[in-house]
Amino acid sequence: MSFTFNVLKNSSQTSARLGKININGIEIDTPVFMPVGTKATVKALTPLMIEETESKIILANTYHLVLKPGLEVLKKFGGVKKFMNWKGAMLTDSGGFQVFSLAKLRKINDDGVEFSSHIDGSKYFFTPRSVMEAEHIIGADFIMCLDECSKHDASYDYVKEAMFRTHKWAKECKEYHDSTPNSEYQYLGGIIQGGMFDDLRKESAETLVNMDFPFYSIGGLSVGETPEQMHEVLSKVMLYTNKQKPRYLMGVSEPRDILNAVMEGIDMFDCVMPTRNARNGEAFTMNGIVRIRNSKYRMDDTVLEEDCDCYTCKNFSKAYLNHLDKTHEILFPILMTIHNVRFMQRFMKDLRNSIENDVFSDYRKDMMNKFY
């Protein structure tokens, strides 16, 4: 089993780059968007449907999988990919973000974090080692260190303390992971923290780069800050990351944010927004959002997007989708999710083509005008 990342082309005007990941025999073109399958399912889609959107890699969540179905189940089935019959690549985050979002239900110290299950209140204690052990059983190709994600408006002192704790945990995660056979086929990413503070972001990036992880994630963004703040942080922190390694921005799928992040050299993205918004009646198109619940679509015989090649757009009108929503049919979230996930993959393919043809700056301006 193996992992390689090659930069194939750099934009002449920005830091955008075209790349290729090969992980355990699976090729992934970058920049890439990963649909989120939190609980071992991308909501409303079968693995075959996911594959048909041309998604090569999906994300699952350690916190949720530890709670349900539980590690004993996943161990019996040989990991989450076999459990759900997914043949592509997978990344699992450590569950740190979910644990820290519980706020009232958790207690943090330098050893780890104690929390109560949001399902039944039962107690759990995540440590760097226990998270690694869980991710080894879950068995994703890419795995993440336990980290502490602070709020965007947290104080300097709090963010600094959380950053030091993140570094300590990253070191412990890596030391344990590297001592196991799993390091031969599971690849561990370090998470850069530091909030909105330039000096802390620089320190975090340099500390983690010195630990020599196979890839790096920019954490602590898309947590309430403005798009301008996100872009400013990215433009600074990317100066200190390793350009030879994939760089992953967690929790982002807004086209504006992806375009800005790719401009700074980000390679990987994930977010629940395309699937969640689909279930709530919002279809993404290259000309903006279609809110299919609007009564104006009741008699509309056009498809969601003329140039889209997804199953939904090849077969069904806006009027039919509007009807499915009004009658609360199960087919509605399925068809909408197929479209939105396929939209994200079409968007990323167009974006990659613009880098290959060295017209990314023009493409970014054009897409910004269409969306905003």
From Swiss-Prot:
Role played: Catalyzes the base-exchange of a guanine (G) residue with the queuine precursor 7-aminomethyl-7-deazaguanine (PreQ1) at position 34 (anticodon wobble position) in tRNAs with GU(N) anticodons (tRNA-Asp, -Asn, -His and -Tyr). Catalysis occurs through a double-displacement mechanism. The nucleophile active site attacks the C1' of nucleotide 34 to detach the guanine base from the RNA, forming a covalent enzyme-RNA intermediate. The proton acceptor active site deprotonates the incoming PreQ1, allowing a nucleophilic attack on the C1' of the ribose to form the product.
GO molecular function terms listed in the Swiss-Prot or TrEMBL record: metal ion binding; tRNA-guanosine(34) queuine transglycosylase activity
Organism: Brachyspira hyodysenteriae (strain ATCC 49526 / WA1)
Co-factor remark: Binds 1 zinc ion per subunit.
Catalytic activity: 7-aminomethyl-7-carbaguanine + guanosine(34) in tRNA = 7-aminomethyl-7-carbaguanosine(34) in tRNA + guanine
PANTHER family assigned to the protein according to its UniProt record, in alphabetical order: QUEUINE TRNA-RIBOSYLTRANSFERASE
Entry binding sites for Zn(2+): 308, 310, 313, 339
Domain of life: Bacteria
Enzyme Commission no: 2.4.2.29
Key words of the record: Glycosyltransferase, Metal-binding, Queuosine biosynthesis, Transferase, tRNA processing, Zinc
Class of enzymatic activity (EC top level): transferase
Keyword hit for Transferase: yes
Gene3D superfamilies reported in the protein's UniProt record: Queuine tRNA-ribosyltransferase-like (3.20.20.105)
Binding sites annotated in the UniProt record for substrate: 93-97, 147, 193, 220
A Gene Ontology biological process term: tRNA wobble guanine modification
InterPro entries documented for this protein: ArchSynthase1/Queuine_TRR, TGT, TGT-like_sf, tRNA_ribo_trans-like
Protein name: Queuine tRNA-ribosyltransferase
Ranges for region RNA binding: 275-279
Subunit note: Homodimer. Within each dimer, one monomer is responsible for RNA recognition and catalysis, while the other monomer binds to the replacement base PreQ1.
Keyword Cell wall biogenesis/degradation on entry: no
Cofactor: Zn(2+)
Entry GO terms, CC: cytoplasm
NCBIfam families recorded: Q_tRNA_tgt, tgt_general
Family in the record: Belongs to the queuine tRNA-ribosyltransferase family.
Pathway: tRNA modification; tRNA-queuosine biosynthesis
Record: active site: 93 (proton acceptor), 270 (nucleophile)
